[in-house]
């Protein structure tokens, strides 16, 4: 896991900016590649590829894009304005959605055998699982930074 100690005392605005650049922008790029790649692998290897993966990744993308938009348009501006505990309700909603993201990651791990492509898998299949693991690791770090550091600090302010 990433070292987040720098964010434990950083100004809220700096933490929000980091989340936007390091996670929101990165997730958008990850899913731009992941979803079409999963659809390609599902089509080419329909007889052996777990059919649910492509749909799950598309659903994860759609849910995460909506989630990030809510943070960017509502929650993060509130945090940057210093509303403190006034952000408790939107933070609660975001944390609930984070639990849904955690469940989706768990299902993806299950479907992919913890991101291990089968022996002899083609390059696209292998790349898909490597990218999916990277996205899941990033999303876990992203959720930790928000829930356990940023949101906790905002609610304590």
Curated annotation (Swiss-Prot):
Keywords carried by this UniProt record: Cytoplasm, Iron, Metal-binding, Stress response
UniProt GO cellular component terms: cytoplasm
Subcellular localization: Cytoplasm
One protein family per Pfam: Hemerythrin
Single annotated GO MF: metal ion binding
Phenotype when the gene is knocked out: Mutant is more sensitive to damage induced by a sudden exposure to nitric oxide and is more sensitive to hydrogen peroxide.
NCBIfam families, alphabetized: FeSrepair_DnrN (NF041614)
Function per UniProt: Di-iron-containing protein involved in the repair of iron-sulfur clusters damaged by oxidative and nitrosative stress conditions. Required to repair damage caused by nitric oxide to FNR and NsrR transcription factors.
Family: Belongs to the RIC family.
Protein name: Iron-sulfur cluster repair protein DnrN
Organism of derivation: Neisseria gonorrhoeae
Gene that specifies this protein: dnrN
């Amino acid at each position: 896991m990433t070292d987040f100690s720098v964010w434990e005392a950083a100004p809220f605005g700096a933490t929000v900016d980091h989340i936007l650049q390091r996670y929101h922008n990165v997730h958008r790029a990850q899913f731009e590649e992941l979803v079409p790649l999963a659809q390609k692998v599902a089509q080419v290897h329909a007889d052996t590829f777990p059919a649910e993966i492509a749909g799950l990744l598309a659903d994860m993308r759609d849910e995460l894009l909506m989630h990030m938009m809510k943070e960017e348009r509502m929650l993060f501006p509130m945090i940057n304005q210093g509303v403190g505990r006034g952000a408790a309700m939107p933070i609660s909603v975001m944390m609930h959605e984070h639990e849904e993201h955690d469940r989706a990651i768990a299902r993806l791990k299950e479907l992919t055998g913890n991101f291990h492509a089968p022996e002899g898998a083609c390059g696209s299949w292998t790349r898909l699982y490597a990218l999916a693991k990277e996205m899941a690791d990033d999303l876990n770090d992203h959720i930790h930074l928000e829930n356990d550091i940023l949101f906790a600090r905002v609610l304590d302010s």
